[in-house]
From Swiss-Prot:
The lineage of its organism: Bacteria, Pseudomonadati, Pseudomonadota, Gammaproteobacteria, Thiotrichales. It comes from the Bacteria. Its EC number is 2.5.1.31. PROSITE patterns: UPP_SYNTHASE. PANTHER family: DEHYDRODOLICHYL DIPHOSPHATE SYNTHASE 2 (PTHR10291:SF0), DEHYDRODOLICHYL DIPHOSPHATE SYNTHASE FAMILY MEMBER (PTHR10291). Substrate binds at residues 35-39, 47, 51, 83, 85, 201, 207-209. This is Ditrans,polycis-undecaprenyl-diphosphate synthase ((2E,6E)-farnesyl-diphosphate specific). One of its GO terms (biological process) is regulation of cell shape. Binds 2 magnesium ions per subunit. One of its GO terms (molecular function) is ditrans,polycis-undecaprenyl-diphosphate synthase [(2E,6E)-farnesyl-diphosphate specific] activity. Keywords: Cell shape, Cell wall biogenesis/degradation, Magnesium, Metal-binding, Peptidoglycan synthesis, Transferase.
């Protein structure tokens, strides 16, 4: 019965997809992976237990994106404000990030996935930076899913960094003020200039937490009470179905669509 229900959900998704407007295509999926600590606490375990048990949800999400030809997946792994958490938890998270990258990079490469880590690397350890650079270098020529991991990232920080970069280029005469518009500005963003189509946040929290503020301008948003370690392909299918049920207007009226 479970298998039948899952295939029925996929059939419904296909029908919705085929009848959607051409501009309503899911190219960029972004996820705020939330609830690991509360999931662990409900099981009387330390917070790192939740983080470790969330890796399977990451695997399932990546697999879904590959199967459904989603072009880009951005996962919010560690925000700039997360440095305020207890030192032991931060250390455990960084160790887990290193180990997961080390273990998963060969398989990601074999599946033609491009790995990129976006954010400020100045506070990361040399060991972790080395692993990030190895993963990026190994997969940079791949042509499949673009997997981006946001680490020590924040949307406001991203916009400020882009502004500084533009100011420096104007100062040396490489760029004129008249050349600055939304398109040119977006090219300087660490988070990239590809708009997010669908944002998912788990755990029941309903906020952006300073994540990809520029790129989320016209994103559809799906909030679920499910904790990230329990997030599955079935819940992701529901989120995608919700996305394709939406009428994306981009400033136009409903009658113009």
């Amino acid at each position: 019965m479970f298998i039948l229900s899952y295939h029925l959900a996929n059939l419904i998704f296909f029908i919705i997809f085929m009848t959607s407007a051409k501009e309503n295509i899911l190219r960029h999926l972004a996820i705020i992976m939330d609830g690991n600590g509360r999931w662990a606490k409900s099981r009387l375990k330390p917070r790192i237990f939740g983080h470790r048990n969330s890796v399977s949800s990451v695997d399932a999400t990546i697999e879904y994106c590959v199967e459904n030809n989603i072009e880009m997946l951005t996962l919010f792994a560690f925000g700039r404000d997360n440095w305020l958490r207890p030192a032991q938890e931060v250390s455990d998270l960084m160790d887990l990030f290193y180990k997961t990258l080390k273990d998963k990079t060969p398989k990601l490469h074999d599946n033609n996935i491009v790995v990129t880590v976006v954010g400020d690397r100045s506070r990361l350890s040399n060991k972790l930076i080395g692993m990030i650079e190895y993963s990026e270098s190994l997969t940079k020529s791949n042509t499949g899913l673009k997997l981006r991991l946001a680490v020590d990232y924040a949307g406001r920080w991203d916009i400020v960094e882009a502004t500084r970069a533009i100011a420096r280029e104007v100062d040396i005469g490489k760029l004129s003020v008249d050349e600055i518009d939304q398109n040119s500005f977006a090219k300087y963003l660490v988070g990239g200039n590809m708009p997010v189509d669908l944002l998912i946040r788990t755990s029941g929290e309903v906020r952006l937490s300073d994540f990809m503020l520029w790129q989320l301008a016209y994103a559809e948003m799906y909030f679920t009470d499910i904790m990230w370690p329990d997030f599955s392909k079935q819940e992701l299918t529901r989120a995608v179905e919700y996305f394709y049920s939406r009428q994306r207007r981009f400033g136009k009226s409903g009658e113009q669509i």
